[in-house]
Structure formats: C-alpha cells, structure tokens
C-alpha cells in the first residue's frame, strides 16, 4: 500500500577515460584507466507518506569512488600473459535512523581498496588444448576480517578439442572468487559509535564448471554444463538469524544491521544452451537451467534461497526481413520461488514497517513467472549516420507477475482506522498483466 512504500531518491554521476599504448617491440599493449563515480541514495519510510512526516526509518547514504586500473598484455613465444592491478579510493557516508530498534547514528569512512591479478594462456597438443591459469588478490585498508593473502583467488580452465575438426569440445573451469562486504555493512554502527561489522570477512565462492560443446556449424553451437558453486564466509543477519541471500528481495536497505561471516551456501545444477548466430536471416539463444540453491541460517541449517526456482528458461532471437525490417522477441520463465511471509503480530507493532517471518522460509512459494516481449525495427542507412525506429510491446502474452500477499491496517469504507487495530490482507488490482507498448529511435553517427 502507499503507506508502506518507501520514498527513494537517487542521483548518480559517472566519468572515465582510458589510454592504450603498444609496447615498442610490438608484443603487447598497456591500458591505463581512470574513472570516478558518485551515488547519492535517500531511503525513507514515514508513517504518513503523503505529508512525509513522522519518520519510521531513514537511511541517507553517499558513495564516491575513484579508480585507477593498469593492465598489461604481453606475448612471449606461445604464451599470452595478462598482468594488472587496481587502486580505488572510497568515501562512504551514512545517516541512519531506525525507530523500531532505537538506532540513530552518522558514519563516514574513507579507505583504499587494492588488488592485483595475473593470467597466462597458451595452447598445447597441436592446438587441441587451450589452457589458462591465473590468480587474483584483493584487500582494503578498512575492514579487518581478512588480508590480501587471505583473499588469494586461484583460477584454472581448459578446453580440449575431442575431434580434430574442432566441433566437439570438453570444457572445464575451476576458480575461487572473493567479494568485499558492502559499504552498508562496513559503515554500520551502534549508538555508541562502534563499527560492529568492521571484522567482516570477504565472501568466498568456489566455482566448479564442466561440460561439452558441440559446434554443428560455423554459426551454431550446443552446450551442456554441470556447475557447483560453494559459498563460505557469507554474511548472516544476527537480528533475523538468516542469510542475507534470503533478504533484500524488495525495496530495502540490505546489510544495515549486525552480521556474522559464518554463513555458507551452495548452488548446483545443469544448464543447456543453443546459440544460433545470424544465418539465413535468423539468430537466437535458448537456455534452460535446472538448479538448487541453499544458504545456511545462524544455526547452520541449509534453507532454500529466495531465487531457488528450480527451473529457468530464456529465449531471445529475431528474424531479419527485407528492406531493413526486423522482428525480435524475448521470453523468460522461472519456476516457483520461495518467499518469506509476513509476521502479522510483529508487523502490527512496527507498522508501517513490514516484519517478515523467516522461520517459515521455504514453506510457501510464489507462482511461476512467465513473460514475453516482442519488438519491430525499421532501419535506414544514410551516408554519415543510420536511423533506427522501433516499436516494442512488453508482456504481449498478458501474463501476471506473481506477488506475495500484502497486508494493511483494517479500515472502514470511509478510510478511517477500525479500533482495535488489526491487519487484513489487501485486495489489489492486478495491473502486472497489462501489456506495455513503447516506441523509440536510435541514431548512430
């Protein structure tokens, strides 16, 4: 309802430039990049959204990042080497007020983030084996949970041509990846000014992927892969006792709470893909994934993640007609996904802030998601530019988007609250199944 919706205001600025220079011997290239970006995000929830008075929750955050990246590509005999480093100056400030938990603090942190990586590539066995090995390391000057060596990420991959005609391949890749805690987590403080998440660790994920690829022609290929992703040091909420992988599905501030880095997770499944490059006026990509996704609570129990839909299907493709006409379509399907139901009693106390009942995670699911879009393009090629006019219809199959049940305070026909206060399920007019037409143009110089 309107009284539950947060008021969100955002502003972003991004700028950057890069400089590339070949080495004098001609065996490589050095790329230097400089970029900066700013993000201002004001997130507020009021008891009265119309007048925007009586604040319940407020989170005003500002981020400023300045990055320098260096990348060197060199060729030595049969080897291709890639070496790089990055430096980032980060400034983050946050003003938070949470009436429900009696929290009110201001924070400002400024720190450096740095990393380095290296990779070597070459072919063996008469060009039948493509081999790559490398690593990456990351750290920062603020968080104390892990160091540069703790975040060492080795990676290995190869592709072996099972037949000399290069049509049938076996692919395998193994890698470790680290992700820094978010600014919201690192900047979280209690009322005494203590940074409660400063010792949070980088989230670790180990990826194992293997499969086969068959190139039936120069313009089409079929792949089937099995994957297993294992997560550790994953942030877990100490308030709700649930992994942050199962929070933040809506418009919320994620990580603005005390967390533990003891969470674990795993995602595994099979994916098959068919890709057709432009051939006989047709192009397209079709993919199907069957998977499981689980993350642990504070007690170590594995629970389904909120994106554990079991089935994912996607298609995008098109057909080029005569006289520069083109028709294209996109289709997405997702199986039933778990969601967290509302805790009625707790929400009645905290209203308009909605409290979810994470104890019931995995017991209820949303219906399947199914949506298709269609687009028509007409292109004119002129001497110095091209003009593309398009007409698009989103959700042209008129499918509804599944939503969990919503609750609001019980009111009479005049809109006045009924005493004693109670929550009732809201009846909503389903407009998610409405097709959305749009028209636009693109000019290329």
Map each language-model feature to its residues:
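Face-selective signature of the C-terminal outer-membrane beta-barrel domain
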Residues: 6-147, 161-164, 220-223, 277, ...
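Residues that define the transmembrane beta-barrel architecture of outer-membrane proteins
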Residues: 9-13, 62-66, 108-114, 148-152, ...
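Transmembrane beta-strands of outer-membrane beta-barrel pores
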Residues: 34-40, 76, 87-93, 135-141, ...
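Surface-exposed extracellular loop regions of Gram-negative outer-membrane beta-barrel proteins
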Residues: 40, 91-93, 146, 160, ...
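Outer membrane beta-barrel strand-and-loop segments of large Gram-negative receptors
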Residues: 56-71, 107-117, 197, 201, ...
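Structural signature of Gram-negative outer-membrane beta-barrels, strongest in the C-terminal barrel
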Residues: 78, 107-232, 280, 287-289, ...
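Gram-negative outer-membrane beta-barrel transporters
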Residues: 123-129, 228-230, 254-341
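C-terminal beta-signal and adjacent terminal beta-strands/loops
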Residues: 284, 332-352, 367-371, 378-445
């Amino acid at each position: 309802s309107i009284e539950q919706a947060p008021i969100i205001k955002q502003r972003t600025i991004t700028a950057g430039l890069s400089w590339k220079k070949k080495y004098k011997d001609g065996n490589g290239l050095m790329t230097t990049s400089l970029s900066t970006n700013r993000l201002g995000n004001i997130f507020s929830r009021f008891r009265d959204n119309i007048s925007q008075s009586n604040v319940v929750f407020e989170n005003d955050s500002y981020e400023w990042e300045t990055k320098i990246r260096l990348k060197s590509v060199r060729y030595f005999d049969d080897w291709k080497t890639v070496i790089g480093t990055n430096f980032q100056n980060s400034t983050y400030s946050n003003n938070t007020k949470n009436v429900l938990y009696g929290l009110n603090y201001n924070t400002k942190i400024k720190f450096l983030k740095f990393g380095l990586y290296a990779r070597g590539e070459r072919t063996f066995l008469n060009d039948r084996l493509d081999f790559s090995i490398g690593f990456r390391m990351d750290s920062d000057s603020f968080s104390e949970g892990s160091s540069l060596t703790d975040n060492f990420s080795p990676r290995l991959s190869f592709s072996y041509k099972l037949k000399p005609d290069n049509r049938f391949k076996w692919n395998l890749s193994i890698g470790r990846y680290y992700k820094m805690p978010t600014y919201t987590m690192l900047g979280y403080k209690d009322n005494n000014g203590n940074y409660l998440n400063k010792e949070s660790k980088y989230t670790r994920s180990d990826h194992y992927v293997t499969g086969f690829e068959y190139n039936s022609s120069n313009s089409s290929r079929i792949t089937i892969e099995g994957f297993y992703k294992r997560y550790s040091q994953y942030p877990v909420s100490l308030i709700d006792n649930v992994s942050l992988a199962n929070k933040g599905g809506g418009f919320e501030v994620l990580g603005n709470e005390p967390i533990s880095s003891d969470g674990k997770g795993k995602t595994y499944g099979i994916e098959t893909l068919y890709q057709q490059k432009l051939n006989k006026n047709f192009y397209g990509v079709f993919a199907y994934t069957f998977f499981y996704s689980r993350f642990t609570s504070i007690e170590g129990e594995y629970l389904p993640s909120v994106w554990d839909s079991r089935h994912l299907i996607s298609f995008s493709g098109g057909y080029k007609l005569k006289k520069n006409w083109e028709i294209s379509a996109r289709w997405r399907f997702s199986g039933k996904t778990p969601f967290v139901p509302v805790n009625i009693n707790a929400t009645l106390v905290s209203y308009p802030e909605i409290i979810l009942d994470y104890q019931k995670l995995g017991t209820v699911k949303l219906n399947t998601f199914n949506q298709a879009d269609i687009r028509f393009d007409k292109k004119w090629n002129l001497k110095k530019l091209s003009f593309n006019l398009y007409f698009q219809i989103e959700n042209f199959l008129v499918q509804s988007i599944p939503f969990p049940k919503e609750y609001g305070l019980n009111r009479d026909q005049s809109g006045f609250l009924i005493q004693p206060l109670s929550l009732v399920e809201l009846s909503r007019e389903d407009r998610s199944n409405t097709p959305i037409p749009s028209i636009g143009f693109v000019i290329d110089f």
